[in-house]
Amino acid sequence: MAEVAETPSVEAQEEVAQPAEAQVLEAKNGDAKKDPAPAAEEAAGGFTKQERAIIRQVEYYFGDANLNRDKFLREQIGKNEDGWVPLSVLVTFKRLASLSTDLSEIVAALNKSEEGLVEISEDKLSLRRHPERPIPEHNEERRKEIQERTAYAKGFPLDSQISELLDFAANYDKVVNLTMRKHYDKPTKSYKFKGSIFLTFETKDQAKAFLEQEKIVYKERELLRKWQVDYLKEKQEEYAQKNEKRKNKKEAKPEPAFELPKNAIVVFEGAPETSSREEIREAFEKIKDFEVAYIEFAKGETKGSVRLTEADAAEKYIAKVEEGKLKFKDEVSLSLRKATEEEEKEFIDKAIEFMKKRRDFTRNKGKRFNRKRHGGNDHKHGGGKKARGD
């Protein structure tokens, strides 16, 4: 029977983020609409539609794909020395509960299964995975083996239900896992079906037979089909191209250059060692029609530089000061002169370097703020328990 995986899987991010590597995507079950009432008569093989759905769902719970990631169910299995899980626990799982909560009905359906995966206890109140069917170790080798027998199919209506897709999968021998691929829709804050699925077959030959069929039509739509490994490789290449294009675009757009006015630096000497930068500014700003942009001066020194905001302002400023002497305080005057070309170049280079560092710091600070704002440290968010999706 097919194992069911209807999911907001990690691949739901693919529209906006680049995967680190091609990977077999894990999934969790979500809510499902209740299937229509089963037909009274038995279908081919002696199963009603309701029985098939119950068997399919329970065997999914105990199947390889689900047990490898379902921590809650593994915990329930571990509570009993022999691995029995009470049916009363299983019927709390949303999808099984949507089919039936009648324990006798579930047991009766499972008694008809020929898979031999699930065993029923003598009192008919508990189930377990058959001891002769141990869970395969989930490692890199196993991941690749699963990927090699998984197909990708696209073209399903966006409003498709999991039950409809399972009915579709039942036509092919033999699908053991079906993943509905979804994306997160921001306006509705919900996961929506993308119209494509992954089908994992029991063997690679079965997957190959599905892919090699000349044409498969679902509800008058021809499906696009390919190996999952090929699909993931194409996506990786697509992401790499997008990133390269984005990188090239960024490199093609140079950072705006910092330009400072020329001939705007006045060098002063004769300041008392106790002078502060604020006092220097106050003295320079007494000369009207000139604006101070930056002062390079450290307390304890007697010499420094003042950059004015406009080009060619240095000579004009000095011309307004009597004999090149700027009154400071306590009858102290500062001797002024225009900076030499070498001094000006050194001053401007240092100023531009400082401005670049400040710009980079501000930009990185903004990025850090946005990461925190949008949940960059996911492990620190959400103190409550995560609801179990079954």
From Swiss-Prot:
* Pfam families, per database record: La, RRM_3
Q: Name one GO molecular function term.
A: mRNA binding
Q: Which PANTHER family match?
A: LUPUS LA PROTEIN HOMOLOG, LUPUS LA PROTEIN-RELATED
Gene Ontology biological-process annotations = positive regulation of translation; tRNA processing
Q: Which domain of life is it from?
A: Eukaryota
Q: Which protein are we looking at?
A: La protein homolog
Gene that this sequence comes from? La
Where the record annotates domain RRM, the positions are: 149-234
Which compartment or compartments is the protein found in? Nucleus
Instruction: Give the Basic residues compositional bias ranges.
Output: 362-374
Predominant localisation class = nucleus
Q: Where is this region: Disordered?
A: 26-46, 362-390
Task: Keywords in alphabetical order, please.
Answer: DNA-binding, Nucleus, Phosphoprotein, RNA-binding
- What are the residue boundaries of the HTH La-type RNA-binding domain, all occurrences included? 44-137
The residue ranges of the xRRM domain are 259-386
Residues annotated with Phosphoserine modification:
9
